[in-house]
Amino acid sequence: MSNDSSDNQIRRRHHPVLPKGSFQKKDDSIVLEQELSTPKQVNQARPKFPSPITPTLPEMHLPVGNSKFQAVLPSLISPTLPPGFGMASDDSEASLAENDLHPLDNDSTRTSKTLKNSSEVLTASKLTDEGNSKPLLEEGEVAVSSPILLDSKDVIMGVTKSSKNLVEDAHKSKKASTNSSINNMVSTVNSENSNVNNGSSLNGNTSSNLKRKANVTLGDYKRLKVKNKNPSSQELITADVDKTSGSLSEKSEVNHASLKKTYMRLLNSGKMQKKECDKKGKFFEAYAVDAVLCYTVAFHLQNLSNLSRNHPATTSNWRTLPAYIQFLIKEEDKLDPCIQGLFFLLLGIAFREIFHIEVMRIRHSQLNLMRDIKESSSGLTSAKSLGDAQNLCENAVRLYSSYKHYITSMKKGSSLLTIEYISSTAPNTFNEFFVQKKANIPLPLDIDAPIGVTIRFSHNLLNEWIKKQGDVFESKLLKEDIENLQSLEESYPIAQYL
């Protein structure tokens, strides 16, 4: 018996099984739970985030063409909220300008506009010559008691002040309109008043169904007040609109065919310079820097072309640069500090553009989730909502990774390309960008400097460094390409889309 019990203990100790009904004791269950639990090393393992170079998320499939969802979904590069998330206040000047530019053509709006201009003319025209305070009503006519404000200082909810003020207002309105328009407005009001019950009084002490209900908003009052206060306000608004439309038309006149040719030419130039770098000549690293410069300008031109056509940006091209640059700088001891600094500077540009595009995507996914949460009462149950939530989480991981690499690369490049080193190695470049630079152009080593400024600085520094080394080098990147890039950056700054 003793041997059997010992065998059972050994078997139970080395081969744990689930407890049966007869062994459901408190101590035994605790021991068995500890033996069958997951090891602590598995729980403490860190999750493996995706690499910042290789994309792990498929591209989002947005509706193409004239879809019914096109008006609801916000643009990938537009930070504005869709129309369902908020309403513009009537006090804002933007809403006033929009109402002036896009009037409605329905009957109720036309009626309210004629009432605003003709009510004071009709009231003033029926005053007596002796200056009586009460207007004279002809037979068969009924006074309209509507809450239309002729002026905030003269009339409050249909109750007039004095006949003198009304006469002055009538003279002002007569100067602003012709006699034919006044007759048309008066006839319009008389025809509309004929439909009102004859039992209504002047002060409006009648039933609610007999009162005239005008379709007037606060924006109409404010437009009338601004027009009376400043007659040239409408001209100023139209001038601003013409200026804005002119700038939009200039922005839309981008020669996309020429940009495509430049893009293809720079890609071929980058491939040629990469082949020269692979030959491992005397200054092979200079060809590698020129190849990266050609690729960077080509990819940024493609980005700006997409922004000008309101197309979504892509990171597929930008993600190929970090792997190539990191392959070139893996042996940092054999490279000159100038070449190392330029490599890290261009690496920071690539990660910064990836960061900007991920910001646009994460904002787009956030707006989609906000819309789904607002529309659905049972929560995020659809497959599209769950997909947007997954995209949001994965974009957040890639956003943090690209930002970390972007900051690290820019700091590394700035530490290598110091002011003392640039002034001693390339004095002409130093005088152009640090001594005689314009006030509105940022420094090329700034963490948020435009790509055009950084590319021009890198191109000049590379050519001057090659000349100092006594070597003959022909760059495939033209100055016209850099100037074209800078002009497009001024028209479409990336900051306005973030």
From Swiss-Prot:
Signal peptide: none annotated. GO terms for cellular component: nucleus; super elongation complex. GO terms for biological process: transcription elongation by RNA polymerase II. Transmembrane segments: none annotated. It comes from the Eukaryota. Pfam families: Ebp1_C. GO terms for molecular function: transcription elongation factor activity. InterPro entries: Ebp1_C. Residues 1-48, 99-134, 190-209 are annotated as: Disordered. Residues 99-110 have a biased composition (Basic and acidic residues). Residues 35-44, 111-126 have a biased composition (Polar residues). This is Uncharacterized protein C6G9.15c. It comes from Schizosaccharomyces pombe (strain 972 / ATCC 24843).
